[in-house]
């Protein structure tokens, strides 16, 4: 099964919390803090694997979560770092942010790696907070939570030449005659149901990669037929070979077919429509009147398409000439990276300290309760001792530095209101 798009959820690992611990040894009466740091969370790393040609694996697995770092321990023991999660994808995979559809990365090189989400940083243990004036801190730093993202993986096969045309015009036959690819070939429409790639290695020319996609029909840009959903696989090509059935055995006009395909191409992508084209009149072995080809060639060249060839993929007549012309043109067209405009590029927002604040109005008592919730709050409270004055000062410092007090003031908090974080509640004093 050929799968070329997939939507998945990815999350990097949380950092482990720093430990609150003190030395307690029989002959060490003044032992001091010895809480170790938490380990960092594992990252989400995408890796290009040349042996993979489809996104089929992502049809069955939709969630990828890296390992979290372990919490720190006593005796200055550091928590173990979480294992990073490596996700293997085919070459030519584009990663998009699911909500905006903006591009995060283009993985188009052999062995390429991308650290998509870095793991959360481990929190510092209380030993790191000891000073000359605070020799026994009863607080530690919470680990930072990992990032999470819904993404869309989109595979665009990497080929130099794309074969274009209506169904049953001979694209698959040409691919099978010039490469070692074995596409399904039969005398009916839509025999090709997935893209096929092959390397053209004709004597005397530099080898190049050629892609055959399901045939395009009129109305494809509006979603009719099969070909439009695979056009993305020839978006990266440098050259198009546009094949028409010159024999007319199916009752179609080859020039009208040529016009219709180019109209659909232009609707889909102007950039793709502007790509150089070699026009091939295939099935010449079935042509009963040579004048039909000459008339077709004249009309096409009047439109500005100079390279027009007569060919029979079935008998191999004219095939070498087409392939050599393709190789010659490719020499003058540089390989381009995927062009991504600033508007198309996804820029992540800082989401590590996420929280929500809601208000409960207590009219009878004359004060409001501001409830602060979120993963950040949970982790912060787990790393402080609310019964210790120094620990509380550190706690309030974190709330201030992260903008929580500023947001409370913007929401209208007043002197005497209560602020609740999980089970811990304190009175707000201006």
From Swiss-Prot:
Cofactor(s) recorded in Swiss-Prot or TrEMBL = Mg(2+)
Question: What does this gene product do?
Answer: An essential GTPase which binds GTP, GDP and possibly (p)ppGpp with moderate affinity, with high nucleotide exchange rates and a fairly low GTP hydrolysis rate. Plays a role in control of the cell cycle, stress response, ribosome biogenesis and in those bacteria that undergo differentiation, in morphogenesis control.
Q: Name one Pfam family in it.
A: DUF1967
> Domain named Obg: which ranges?
1-158
Q: Where would I find the OCT domain in this sequence? A: 345-430
Q: Which sites bind GTP?
A: 165-172, 190-194, 212-215, 282-285, 312-314
Report the CDD domains cross-referenced here.
Obg
Q: What is its main location?
A: cytoplasm
Task: Fetch the Gene3D superfamilies from UniProt.
Answer: GTP-binding protein OBG, C-terminal domain, GTP1/OBG domain, P-loop containing nucleotide triphosphate hydrolases
Top-rank taxon, per record: Bacteria
Protein name per UniProt: GTPase Obg
Cite the OBG-type G domain residue spans from the record: 159-331
Q: Kindly list the positions annotated as binding Mg(2+).
A: 172, 192
Q: Which family would the database say this protein is a member of?
A: Belongs to the TRAFAC class OBG-HflX-like GTPase superfamily. OBG GTPase family.
Gene Ontology biological-process entries: ribosome biogenesis
Q: Among the entry's GO cellular component annotations, what is one? A: cytoplasm
Report the subcellular localization. Cytoplasm
* Origin species: Clostridium beijerinckii (strain ATCC 51743 / NCIMB 8052)
What quaternary arrangement does the UniProt entry report? Monomer.
Reported EC number(s) for this entry are 3.6.5.-
| Gene Ontology MF terms in the entry | GTP binding; GTPase activity; magnesium ion binding
Q: Tell me the keywords, alphabetical order.
A: Cytoplasm, GTP-binding, Hydrolase, Magnesium, Metal-binding, Nucleotide-binding
């Amino acid at each position: 099964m050929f799968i070329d798009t997939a939507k998945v959820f990815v999350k990097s690992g949380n950092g482990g919390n720093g430990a609150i611990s003190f030395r307690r040894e029989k002959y060490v009466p003044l032992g001091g803090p010895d809480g170790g740091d938490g380990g960092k969370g594992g990252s989400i790393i995408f890796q290009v694997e040349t042996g993979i040609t489809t996104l089929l694996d992502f049809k069955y697995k939709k969630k990828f979560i890296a390992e979290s770092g372990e919490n720190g321990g006593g005796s200055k023991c550091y928590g173990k770092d979480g294992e990073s999660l490596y996700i293997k994808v085919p070459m030519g995979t584009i990663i998009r942010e699911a909500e905006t559809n903006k591009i995060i990365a283009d993985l188009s090189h052999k062995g390429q790696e991308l650290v998509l989400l870095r793991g959360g940083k481990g929190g510092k243990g209380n030993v790191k907070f000891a000073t000359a004036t605070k020799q026994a801190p009863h607080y530690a730093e919470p680990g930072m939570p990992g990032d999470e993202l819904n993404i869309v993986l989109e595979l665009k096969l990497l080929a130099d030449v794309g074969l274009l045309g209506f169904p049953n015009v001979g694209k698959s036959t040409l691919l099978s005659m010039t490469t070692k690819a074995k596409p399904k070939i039969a005398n009916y429409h839509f025999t090709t149901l997935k893209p096929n790639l092959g390397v053209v290695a004709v004597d005397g020319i530099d080898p190049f990669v050629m892609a055959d996609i399901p045939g395009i029909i009129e109305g494809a840009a509006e979603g009719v037929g099969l070909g439009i959903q695979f056009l993305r696989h020839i978006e990266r090509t440098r050259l198009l070979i546009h094949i028409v059935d010159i024999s007319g055995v199916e009752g179609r006009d080859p020039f009208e077919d040529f016009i219709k395909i180019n109209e659909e191409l232009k609707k889909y992508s102007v950039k793709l429509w502007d790509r150089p084209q070699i026009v091939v009149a295939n099935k010449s072995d079935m042509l009963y009147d040579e004048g039909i080809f000459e008339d077709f060639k004249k009309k096409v060249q009047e439109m500005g398409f100079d390279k027009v060839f007569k060919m029979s993929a079935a008998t191999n007549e004219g095939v070498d000439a087409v392939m050599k012309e393709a190789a010659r043109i490719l020499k003058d067209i540089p390989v381009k990276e995927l062009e991504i405009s600033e508007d198309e590029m996804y820029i992540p927002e800082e989401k590590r300290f996420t929280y929500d604040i809601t208000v409960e109005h207590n009219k009878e008592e004359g004060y409001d309760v501001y409830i602060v919730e979120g993963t950040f709050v949970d982790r912060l409270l787990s790393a402080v001792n609310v019964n210790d004055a120094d620990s509380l000062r550190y706690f309030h410092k974190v709330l201030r530095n992260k903008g929580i007090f500023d947001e409370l003031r913007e929401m209208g908090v007043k002197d005497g209101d209560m602020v609740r974080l999980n089970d811990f509640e304190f009175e707000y004093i201006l």
